[in-house]
Amino acid sequence: MKKSKKSKKSNTWKIKQHRDQFFKKSKSLGYRSRAAFKLIELNEKFKFIKKDTYLLDIGAAPGGWSQVASKIITQGKIMSLDIKKMEEIKNVSFFQCNFLENKTQDRILALFGNKADVVLSDMAADTTGNKSLDCIRTNQLCAEVIEFSTQILQSKGVLISKLFMGEDFLEVKELAGEKFKKVQFFK
């Protein structure tokens, strides 16, 4: 049975309303983005961020994930980076730089060695309007983060990264499976 256009518009409206509710809630609770709720949800389920965690947040701006981490991590280290500027967050070292540059990765390695417990990446490529191309470009960023994470994560380290469903999804999933003992996907 084919959905009517009205039903499709209604679903789009419901999705926007749901997202808007998270936007409003994030602002009322002082979070910089609604992405904060996803990290809270994941950490409540898996408890991978603890008070002594060493955490790297890639693609951090505007800082929702770093905010959440800073409320939990009191004895560890948080390093956040993004090409865009980000307002200061207590107990977070922020660097405005390009993760893909060798000098940035060398700096991260110098600060963390292979002692990071958690790597977060909410990086997304700038959108072009071409959904397929945008998906591929963002998933390539995810693949770069997967490769780099293997250099700085401890043996039981955790990587949380944005990944889009698209034509290269299975390739990136396979790469993650080669590099990590356990791979799970969440929406």
Give the location of each predicted region.
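C-terminal substrate-binding/active-site "lid" region of AdoMet-derived donor-dependent transferases
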Residues: 56, 89-92, 104, 119, ...
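Conserved SAM-binding loop of SAM-dependent methyltransferases across substrates and taxa
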Residues: 62-74
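Glycine-centered, small-residue-biased loops immediately flanking beta-strands
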Residues: 53, 76, 157
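Conserved class I S-adenosyl-L-methionine
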Residues: 51-61
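Class I SAM-dependent methyltransferase Rossmann-like catalytic core
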Residues: 1-51
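Helix-to-beta-strand junctions that scaffold the AdoMet/dcAdoMet cofactor pocket
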Residues: 50, 73-74, 153-154
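S-adenosyl-L-methionine
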Residues: 83-128
